[in-house]
Amino acid sequence: MKNSALFLAISLALAGLAPWSPVHAEGQLLGSYEDRVAIKQLMWDYVRAADTLDEDAYAAVFTPDGSFNQIKGRDALKKMIVDMEKSQAERRQTGQLSGLMHHFMANQTIEFIAEDHARVHYYWQTVFAGRDLANPPRMAAAGRGMDDVVRVDGRWLIQSRNVAPDN
């Protein structure tokens, strides 16, 4: 009996260390720890590229045909960031905007659809930092998002980013 319990404990421990644990008890696909960490890093890379208005880094986190709501393809995504930077500069000149832009993603959960396809669910908000007490931080927008991410050549990328899903 003692050996059986030890064998079971070792088997369970090893199963948790497998690079891909395909199916959970309820039938839901599970990704590996490494995949989950890589996807969380992808989400961080996304918000940093958006916050710093780095159009090349922003487009690089998407698949070549990736989309942000209705904007599709890396060239269009780069243009979106360039236009955002121009708009922010104009609003700063008129005093309508102060402080840097910060995106926050919270309550993030990763649902694996297949070994190389996951869906990330989260709540988000965009805040512009304040300069001082007279210019406090300002929340620009908030909502819920749902992104489809896929593994391409060993790297997780955003295939579609939907920051206004129906439900």
Description of each model-found segment:
Residues 1-10:
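Bacterial N-terminal signal peptides that target proteins for export
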Residues 9-19:
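Bacterial N-terminal signal peptides
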Residues 20-52, 56-61, 75:
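Short, low-complexity N-terminal intrinsically disordered segments enriched in polar/charged residues
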Residues 24-40, 133, 152-167:
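Terminal "cap-and-tail" regions of soluble proteins that handle hydrophobic small molecules
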Residues 37, 99-101, 138-140:
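Transmembrane beta-barrel outer-membrane domains
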Residues 55-125:
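A solvent-exposed, acidic/Ser-Thr-rich amphipathic alpha-helical stretch
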Residues 117-121, 137-167:
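Short beta-strand edge/turn micro-motifs at domain boundaries
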Residues 127-139:
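Short, cysteine-centered beta-strand-loop-beta hairpins and adjacent loop/turn segments enriched
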